Regions:
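N-terminal glycine-rich FAD/FM-binding segment characteristic of electron-transfer flavoproteins
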Residues: 1-294
Length: 294
């Protein structure tokens, strides 16, 4: 079984600071600390559980700037077999429509897969659109809001998914795209052995930086060396995927973020009431005055 997992490095929305909006309506992610989107970690965990039971491999892919390689190294620490960074300046400012187009074409290039996993949604946009849109572009079934994988057969999977007021059991043919809820599983911790093994994994962009100003290092040789050590993170650009530029980045994105802000709930005026019988009487009187009681 081959599982491809869509992961994302997201801005830590709990710590919004500085000027995070650009004039063109896109988010300046460099102004925010970056973290591994939690539901994507859970999606990776489910993919790894399938590998543990049935064998096969797990490939983690992400679309983002060069620094998004950090989240791919975390995937390798957790147990992924391969990692792919999809990065190009022409992808900047992509909304879910443009993102799903790029991801679907990357998945087609990787090919030969049984499952595509993704978190239900990312905490930066909360749209829950990329997974379903990617499935549509791939022309494969999709099951969203997954709580549990119940059974896997050679050509099908049975899944429990959350719905309003309960759950439903669905069976789908393979390949299938599955979006995962945050409580579907608990992500395994990173293993020290894998951290030591993959902490030096590098993308092509990072290898190119190593060769800058060093005439003794040649990028092709360095790439070959890292590939032989299984430390190379495959890097795909718009040209590698032969994409339509009009469908990428800002040009292919009809959606724009109008505003983002940190909402702080501040307490108003309050009155301390003693925790005794007299205080209880005062509290009841005030609740009755406000028509909360009586």
């Amino acid at each position: 079984m081959h599982s491809i997992v869509l992961v994302k490095q997201v801005p830590d929305t709990a710590n919004i600071s500085g000027q995070v909006m650009k004039e063109d309506g896109t988010v300046n992610r460099a102004k925010l600390p970056a973290i591994f989107n939690h539901e994507d970690r859970v999606a990776l965990e489910l993919a790894l559980q399938i590998k543990d039971k049935l064998g096969g491999k797990v490939t983690a892919i992400t679309m983002g700037p060069p620094r998004a390689s950090d989240v791919l190294r975390e995937c390798l620490f957790m147990g992924a077999d391969e990692a792919v960074l999809i990065s190009d300046r022409k992808f900047a400012g992509a909304d879910t429509l443009a993102t799903s187009y790029v991801l679907s074409e990357a998945i087609k290039k990787i090919g030969d897969y049984d499952f595509v996993f993704a978190g239900r949604q990312a905490i930066d946009g909360d749209t829950a659109q990329v997974g379903p849109q990617t499935a549509e572009k791939l022309g494969i079934p999709q099951i969203t809001y997954t709580e549990e994988i119940l059974e896997i057969k050679e050509n099908s999977v049975k899944i429990k998914r959350k719905i309003d007021g309960g759950y439903e059991i669905l069976e789908s043919a393979l390949p299938v795209l599955i979006t995962v809820l945050k409580d579907a599983s608990f992500p395994r911790p990173y293993k020290a052995k894998r951290i030591m093994a993959y902490k030096n994994a590098r993308t092509l962009i990072e290898l190119e930086k190593l060769t800058e100003g060093n005439s003794l290092l040649y990028i092709d040789q360095l790439k070959e060396e890292y590939q032989s050590k299984k430390l190379y993170i495959q890097t795909l650009t718009m040209d590698d995927l032969k994409l339509d530029e009009a469908r990428c980045g800002v040009h292919g994105s009809p959606t724009k973020v109008h505003k983002i802000e940190s909402v702080v709930l501040a307490g108003g005026n309050h009155e301390m009431i003693a925790p005794d019988k007299a205080g209880m009487s005062i509290l009841i009187d005030k609740l009755m005055e406000d028509h909360i009681l009586g």
